[in-house]
């Protein structure tokens, strides 16, 4: 599997809606598409007001698998970008849950 970044701008009206979407995403990925896609992590974006978007890191067999997962889980997938390499300078910082 290759690594991809998925940009989901203004995907949800509030953090609660994002939590519901995350549950659907996990279910589809783990139960229906486990051979084709693996969710690694997401960064939640403040989009103004209560709205949130995400930058998600996935491993997948193809961009088409990511699009199919997004469709099945009812998620936006504004842009899918293949990751060429990873440079880790420092580990991700720990942040308090919102």
Where does each model-flagged region fall?
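Residues at beta-strand starts and edge strands
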Residues: 2, 52-54
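Amphipathic, hydrophobic secondary-structure cores in small proteins
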Residues: 45-47, 54-58
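Generic preference for hydrophobic/aromatic residues in regular secondary structure cores
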Residues: 39, 44, 50, 80-83
């Amino acid at each position: 599997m290759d690594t991809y970044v998925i940009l989901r701008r203004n995907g949800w009206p509030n953090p609660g809606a994002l939590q519901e979407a995350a549950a659907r995403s996990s279910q589809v990925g783990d139960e229906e598409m486990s051979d084709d896609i693996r969710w690694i992590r997401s960064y939640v974006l403040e989009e103004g007001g209560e709205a949130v978007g995400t930058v998600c890191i996935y491993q997948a067999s193809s961009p088409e698998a990511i699009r199919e997962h997004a469709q099945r889980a009812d998620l936006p997938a504004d842009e899918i970008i293949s990751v060429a390499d990873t440079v880790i300078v420092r580990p991700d910082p720990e942040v308090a849950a919102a």
